[in-house]
Structures are given as C-alpha cells and as structure tokens.
Amino acid sequence: DPDYLPFLDGADSTERRDGAQNTADAARKAGITSRSVEETLDDNGSPVVTLSPSAVDNLWACPVCWLLENRFAGPRIGSAATSFGTLIHAVAQKGSAEGLDLPGAVAGSSVESAVDAVAHRLVDIYDAIKPDFSSIAKAAERYTAMLKDEQAETTLHNLASYFVESNASSYLNKNEGKFDIGTLESASCEEEFSARFGLDDICMAYNALPGMSPVGRTALMQLMGILVGGWPEGMREDLTVRLSGRIDRKEMRRLRDGSQTIRLIDYKTGRKRQLAEIFNDLQLVCYQLGLMFPEHGRAGERPHSAQSGLFYVQDDAAPASSYSPESAFQPPLFLNGALNAEGFVARDHYPRLDKFTDIPPLPAGKPSALDAVDDNAWQGFLSWNGTQAMWSLTMIARVFYAAAASRSHVIVAHPTRQHKGHCRMTDVCPACAGQVDTVFETRQA
C-alpha cells in the first residue's frame, strides 16, 4: 500500500520519522526541514531554534553525545528493530482509521472476545504491509527482524487490549476513582504539529499562577536556569523555540461530567524506561507545548490536555503502566493559561509527586548570580517548590536548555544518570564514561 511506504524505509525513532516526513513536505510547508535542529533569525535578528521532540530529549540527556551522533557523524542505517517500530506505528494508524479503537467496534461481544477480534485484524494489517524479512542480506539483521516478527502478535494484542479496554469501566483497575480518562470519541494519528514560543510566553503562564508577584523575562530566565543547573552559553532571553514533529496519537475523549479532554500517546517498541523517565519524558512535554503554542493556531486557544503517556506496546497493554494502567501518566503542563498549579493526582502505589520527579533541591538562599531577581520574586519562586507548577517550569526549562545547547559553541556537559546507564558513546564521551564533566568546544576556521 503506497500510504505505508514511508514506514518501511528503516527509520524508527520519532526523530527519524519526523525527518522523513519533513523532507517529503519541504516543497509545500515552508520552514520544516529534514534536519532535527535548525537555527534561523526572526525579523528582529533574534535566534529561532527549530528542534524535533526527540532532539530535545537527546540534547537534554547529553549534548555532547547528541553532537557526536548528529553533527559529527554521517547518516545512520536503519536497523531491523527500528523498522519494526515504524511498522507498529503504521498498523496502529490503520487500525484507528478503521475505527477499531472506538467503543462498540466489535458489536455484541464480551471484552475478551472483542480484544481477540481487534488483535486478529491488527495482525492481518501487519502481515499485509510487512516486508520479506528473509530477503535481508545481513544474517544478524535478518535474525533480529525475524525475532521481532515473532513478537508482533503479542505486541498487537497489547495494542488491541488498549483499543478495546480503555473504553470499559474496569480499565483503570486500582486507579478507578482516582482519575478519569473518559470514552474515546476520535483519535488523530501521526498528526503533524509545529509550535513557536519564547520566554515572554512562559512568563505570562508563570505570572498567571495564583498569588504570584509578576516577574520579567530576565528574572524568569535566571530562575529557570536554577532548574537546569545553569544555562549553556547559547542561551539568550530573546531566544525563540520552534518545535516540529508528529504526535503518534492524539485522543479526544468525553469525561463522565460531559466535558471533553485531550490525551496524548507516544508508542514505544524499544527498551522500557524507568518510572521517572516515563513521567518526565520530554517528547511528551514537546507535544503538550505544541498544543499550547501552535505556530499557526488561533491566539488564545487553550485546549485542555488531561493525561499524556508513553505506551510500551511490547511490554504493556496500556500506556504509562506501573502496577495499574496509566499510573505513570504525565500531567498537564498548563491549566487555563497558567502553569499547572493543581494538586498532584494520586495513583496506585504513587500517592506523592516526588515519586516521579527528578528536580534537584533548590537553595534556601537566593544565589548571588540572580541579580535580576528580587527577594519577593525569589520567595514566590520557592513557594512552588514540590508542586506540579515547579515540575512544569522545570520541564519547559529543559526544552529551552536543549535549544540553547544546540547553538552553543562551548558546552559544559552534565549527562543525566539515565542516559549514562545506556549510553552508546562511552568510548568517546568522557562525561558518559564516568569521568569529569566535559567541556566540548566547536571551532570554525
């Protein structure tokens, strides 16, 4: 089927899929290119950095490794494992287009038989579009592809379980009564988005917090710098961030009270991450920012986003699973135009926000470097410590960090603990090899 040719080219990661789509659309969509990071200037001469969501994720994890893999390396060949990921994305999209995820998709059946029927159809779709794995030249790649192929039925049964059971009253298990995900009305798959925002936009959301004494852009930049361990030298207060990519699955759901809400789902077919990584995932953060600051959307639109989650379809039958479905979902960054100041929603086994967050401790006294922050602003900032509002600001600060790091000539690298645990570049990145923090400098003749 020609509609699925883009999924069969060996690309897998969200970044590569975004790049492939952007290349195809370059002639008709100005400003979206195949590069995962690009810098331009706006009409005032201020920098505009365009990033894909996965570039944000990787730059925050370790900017040196990102440079080595993306700026100082040639094109990477797709693997059997990555091709499998894009196949699953294609099957999920086709299944949703056929309405297999809607309530009552299989009429007159029990939940179990409906799951089996939907899984059978998803396997048929998979079999129709998968390539001939026996034709892969390299033996190791051929073996990996065939191994993945054997796992497809289990993976697609997990996907079918979500399609059917997420509309059932028993879906949330021990999270029932703690929060509501509603009933699916429609889903948009592989939806392109582009977002554009700067510190002025974040300042408005920060100052809209209850009881907050307003701060200016310079002060907010200094406060956000505390949350990321200091800014790269490429950070400027007039920096504009532009995000471009595709959302795997955007759901419109109707809640029990009659209100409508949006859920964002990102499919994953690789290694399942640790709990904090799932909750703090920056690709999901980028999708949320795409809803809040659409580049071409109408000003003032603020859609209500409820839960966002990573869906490890090889391991789980629901997104953000931990003990019960959805326990590790990512909460909204914003509510009613402000940073999310609501209390944390307790989940099965996780009654407190600090079970998920990885925010470093804040100093009690105001650092001397924060010369644009007065005492009232500092105390106002500290008053949100340990809340979802501080978590939201931290996640947004990491996106700005990634944008600043991508345009920096000198980078002091502080790789995240999670990245160092599975880094592929330890032979060439001293910071990830467990040595001292690395200063990486690029020079142009």
Residues of each region from the PLM?
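RecB-family 4Fe-4S metal-dependent nuclease core
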Residues: 1-445
